[in-house]
Amino acid sequence: MKMKLYRAYAKVNIFLKIQGSRGNYHEIVSRFMRVPSLYDELSFVPKESSEEFELIGSFSCKREQNTIYKAYRALLEFLDEASGLHVENLMQKYAVKVTKNIPTFAGLGGGSSDAATFLKMCNEVLHLGLSQNELALIGLHVGADVPFFIYGYNSANVSGIGEVVEEFKEELLDIEVFTPQLEISTPKVYNLYRENFYNPVDGFEVERLKKISSKDALSAMSAAEANDLFAPAIQLYKELKNHYKYGYYFSGSGSSFFRVKEKENI
């Protein structure tokens, strides 16, 4: 098999508002935007071990907790026996090599992007014939952000618990990302939001946000106004205050901040 490098891009949340709750999950409305300058690289390489599933790369978690492995298990669950055997045979011969550039626990979707890219790699290499909608359905079992990365849009309105992804046609902004050396727990941030900050956005505001360009949205809102998780994250991780700078916005549950680079005058 000819070795090919696949890029798994980061994302930022231009805005992230909570619409309500669904059991233990929160329903959101958010504008996801791809960051072309920040990506992990994935490839299949010949295996050197007898492990059922081999990952090569710098990971801070056990294999069973890795989103790529979770995507592998979810893919097998979805496929019929014959197609599942093709996937298993592939992983008996090849390992997944990952060059990590996207910081983890940072609100940039690195793990979700890796999982989505792995699913697309398997679909392409093995000619599984899965549609984007089917891949997104599989990916949702791995994480709420995975469907966005499956579709590969530059920009999209994401709602529900992540399963509704609607392309938003606009130019990509030149995003600069800054990630403090802090590991943020997304569940803890959401739990504190529900306990102390719960104030769902109304339907009229949801529709307005879905129509506004990302550039205009950022111009009109502060970091706290744009992201409902900013306040609980700051309360939980007080060090974040020391890293916040005027003109920067907060992505996901953190810890990353981002801004739009100013165009240089020539």
Swiss-Prot record:
Signal peptide: none annotated. Keywords: ATP-binding, Isoprene biosynthesis, Kinase, Nucleotide-binding, Transferase. Its EC number is 2.7.1.148. The keyword Nucleotide-binding applies. The active site is at residues 11, 145. ATP binds at residues 103-113. Transmembrane segments: none annotated. It holds the Pfam family GHMP_kinases_N. The keyword Hydrolase does not apply. GO terms for molecular function: 4-(cytidine 5'-diphospho)-2-C-methyl-D-erythritol kinase activity; ATP binding. Coiled coil: none annotated. GO terms for biological process: isopentenyl diphosphate biosynthetic process, methylerythritol 4-phosphate pathway; terpenoid biosynthetic process. It catalyses: 4-CDP-2-C-methyl-D-erythritol + ATP = 4-CDP-2-C-methyl-D-erythritol 2-phosphate + ADP + H(+). Pathway: Isoprenoid biosynthesis; isopentenyl diphosphate biosynthesis via DXP pathway; isopentenyl diphosphate from 1-deoxy-D-xylulose 5-phosphate: step 3/6. Catalyzes the phosphorylation of the position 2 hydroxy group of 4-diphosphocytidyl-2C-methyl-D-erythritol. Belongs to the GHMP kinase family. IspE subfamily. This is 4-diphosphocytidyl-2-C-methyl-D-erythritol kinase. It comes from Sulfurimonas denitrificans (strain ATCC 33889 / DSM 1251) (Thiomicrospira denitrificans (strain ATCC 33889 / DSM 1251)).
